[in-house]
Amino acid sequence: MMKAIQIHETGGPEVLRLDELPIPEPGPGQVLIRVEAVGVNFIETYFRKGTYKATLPLTLGSEGAGTVEKLGPGVTAFAEGDLVASVSIMGSYAEYALVPAEKLVKVPSRVTPEQAAAAMLQGMTAHYLAYSTFELKAGDTALVHAGAGGVGLLLTQVAVRLGAKVITTVSTEEKAALSREAGAAEVILYTEQDFEVEVKRITDGKGVDVVYDSVGKTTFEKSLNCLRPRGLLALFGASSGPVPPFDLIQLAGKGSLFVTRPTLWHYVATRQELEWRAGKILDWVATGELKLRMEHVYPLAEAAQAQIDLEARKTTGKILLEP
């Protein structure tokens, strides 16, 4: 038997249950993983609330790393004992997880399970945002909301690698220091300053080339106002709630702007893309070129508290669960 965090109904953190389940057997093309570290992400809260639909009961968890325990028929790319990591498959909030082999990547020997779980989803999100959704280049200016969060810290580092100037928004001086350490050229305390006014001041009224917005409802309108003509808003999350209905004609009046709502799954849909993005991120972690913050580690049984702290913005960097 194994322990797993499941939801049998949607709602608040109180619906998370620590259940005992049979250890599953891998079928054709599947791999059984003994989970050693689990990443906690906002996407799991969307499933918990019912924003994203799923069949219940559901074992939560979209990101994890661990050791290959058993191979299903037809799996040849991995061996028992391999350290592997995965994203995009629910089920990692558990002691064991079944994962399609095509969704797994091998973890370099210099990377720990904790580092892999901390880097995969948020690191690849940073990668696709900076390399594909809006291809950052030297001289570009980017506004990154939640600059001290898991994605924010990694996205800032990736953007700076590409030669971009990064402006971030954060809620406290402590988080501002972390954001600057990651490479942000300018940090705005949105609790004390109007970020739209500050961005206009910093850019001499020109606006930024791209806004990376994971906040949603409370930042969307002002984020649009921060863009230069023909700039792009990448709305890749909604931690403050979904954006209300919006008349697209407003984009013309604000400068022929572009808006996109990307998700990681469409940027790792092929094996080639998954290996490219995961390979880059894990290599950067292995060499120390990408710095991770993993100061918040909870036992698996405290998954509800981990989600409470995530949603309350009490944490910085990556939250992990330890089975």
Task: Tell what function each PLM region has.
Residues 22-39, 49-91:
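Glycine-rich beta-strand-centered segment in the early N-terminal region that forms part
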Residues 272-323:
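C-terminal hydrophobic helical "lid"/dimerization subdomain
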Residues 83, 141, 165, 231-232, ...:
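Short glycine-centered segments of the SAM/dcSAM-binding site in methyltransferase folds
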Residues 195-205:
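Short amphipathic alpha-helix with an adjacent loop that forms part of the alpha/beta core around
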Residues 37, 46, 83-148:
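NAD(P)H dinucleotide-binding glycine-rich loop of Rossmann-like/cofactor-binding domains
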Residues 170-173, 218-289, 323:
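Glycine-rich phosphate-binding loop and adjacent beta-alpha segment
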Residues 117-193:
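Mid-domain Rossmann-like dinucleotide-binding core that forms the NAD(H)/NADP(H) cofactor-binding site
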